[in-house]
Design a protein with these regions (language model features):
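Arg/Lys-rich, positively charged N-terminal/basic patches that mediate binding to nucleic acids
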Residues: 1-42
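Short, charged, intrinsically disordered terminal tails
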Residues: 2-3, 7, 61, 99-104
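Residue-level recognition of specific faces of alpha-helices
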Residues: 15, 42-45, 68, 80
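Short, hydrophobic secondary-structure boundary micro-motifs
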Residues: 32, 54-58, 102
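Enriched for short, Lys/Arg-rich terminal
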Residues: 71-104
Length: 104
């Protein structure tokens, strides 16, 4: 089977960059780099194993089929995505304490 194409939403890109900036300001470059590597690892994993992330149970029918995976080393941060045979679409990369259904 062909590996699906990766698509990052504008919101996911903004989430990742916002968190990099936050870590740079709070803890410096080493933690920001660790975050970038962890997000890259999580994205690579869902592209390779898209069915591995559990389905989310949101009330909204528009969010059916959304899956999640934790960011390694940052377990409170979650990557939300959908997939089909052709692509893995990353919706958001956010802290799990936020109003997730509203954000997605």
């Amino acid at each position: 089977m062909k590996k699906p194409r990766l698509v990052l939403s504008d919101s996911a890109i903004a989430d990742i960059l916002e968190q990099v900036d936050w870590y740079l300001g709070q803890s410096g470059r080493p933690l920001a780099r660790r975050w970038e590597k962890a997000v890259t690892s999580a994205i690579s994993y869902v592209v390779t194993h898209p069915a591995a992330g559990p389905l989310c149970t949101f009330k909204s029918p528009e969010l059916r089929g959304v899956r999640r995976t934790a960011i390694p080393g940052f377990p409170k941060h979650l990557l939300f995505y959908r997939f089909d045979e052709a692509e893995v679409f990353v919706l958001r990369v956010v802290h799990g304490a936020r109003d997730l259904e509203r954000l997605l």
